[in-house]
């Protein structure tokens, strides 16, 4: 499932392609069609991300809530580009682009100003990517859930909004915190490291299109890996811990371990993440 940085990037791309200009809107999913008449001759005012959801606001006060879940995707195509062979939910045509929502099943029509009443949005915690949310805010928020396992809490959008499986694994490795510890057992220093890593890695993932490691380190790893196997993709070098079971930790060379926690794969370094506070 796309995480906060991916939805943030998608919302920015869609906004740049369609906002504040004439559009032709085609609604293809039955749940979307009731607004077809009301959305004639309108423009898109703005497109914003809310955790893993997107809000597309139209000039008549109607707002489209959409959540990609596992298979949905917003794609910006050029005007003459062939569409993907996937289920099309809606198309926003402009003079230069076709913006398509593919395969999503979770959407709703809302009104501007009432978005926070939507059940998903109403339960969101502080947005990690929000520039107004500081590391201190994150520390205070996490401290409200002392009995929660830190790895579980970071996936709970009610606790913090925008983190998913790859970010929680990498955040906890960078912070040198054992993912199975309860929040109440962590020191103030550990909580601050987690909070700072939440901000840093989320922002870096936006800036680097999903790469959580520093760019120079990532590129150096890619070059080294390519010498051993030319078929290795960027996936093998982009993360600190996520999806690297058995691969050496970038810092200490201990093999990364995978366990199942809450039905999800959880990756960590048993050496670095058992270090003292």
Q: Which residues are covered by each model-predicted region?
A:
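Gly/Gly-Pro- and Ser/Thr-rich, intrinsically disordered tail segments characteristic of DNA damage-repair
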Residues: 1-110
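Basic, nucleic-acid-binding surfaces and adjacent catalytic neighborhoods in DNA/RNA-processing proteins
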Residues: 22-36, 48, 144-277
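Phosphate/anion-contacting hairpin/loop surfaces
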Residues: 64-174, 182, 189, 194
């Amino acid at each position: 499932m796309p995480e906060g940085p991916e939805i943030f990037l998608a919302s920015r791309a869609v906004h740049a392609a369609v906002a504040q200009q004439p559009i032709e809107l085609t609604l293809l999913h039955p749940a979307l069609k009731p607004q077809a008449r009301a959305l004639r001759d309108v423009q898109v005012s703005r497109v914003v991300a809310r955790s893993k959801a997107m809000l597309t606001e139209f000039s008549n006060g109607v707002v489209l809530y959409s959540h990609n879940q596992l298979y949905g995707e917003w794609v910006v195509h050029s005007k003459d580009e062939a569409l993907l062979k996937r289920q099309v939910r809606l198309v926003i045509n402009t003079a230069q682009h076709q913006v398509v929502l593919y395969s999503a099943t979770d959407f709703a029509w809302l009104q501007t100003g009432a978005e926070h009443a939507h059940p998903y949005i109403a339960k969101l915690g502080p947005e990690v990517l929000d520039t107004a949310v500081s590391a201190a805010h994150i520390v205070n928020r996490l401290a409200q859930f002392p009995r929660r396992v830190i790895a579980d809490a970071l996936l709970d959008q009610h606790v913090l909004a925008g983190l998913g499986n790859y970010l929680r694994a990498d955040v906890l490795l960078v912070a040198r915190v054992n993912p199975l510890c309860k929040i109440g057992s962590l020191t103030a220093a550990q909580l601050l490291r987690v909070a700072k890593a939440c901000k840093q890695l989320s922002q870096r993932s936006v800036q680097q299109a999903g790469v959580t490691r520093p760019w120079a380190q990532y590129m150096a790893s890619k070059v080294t890996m390519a010498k051993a196997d030319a078929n290795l993709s960027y996936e093998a070098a982009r993360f600190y811990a996520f999806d690297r079971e058995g691969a050496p930790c970038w810092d200490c060379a201990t093999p990364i371990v995978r366990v199942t926690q809450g039905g999800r794969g959880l990756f960590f370094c048993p050496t670095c993440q058992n270090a003292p506070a």
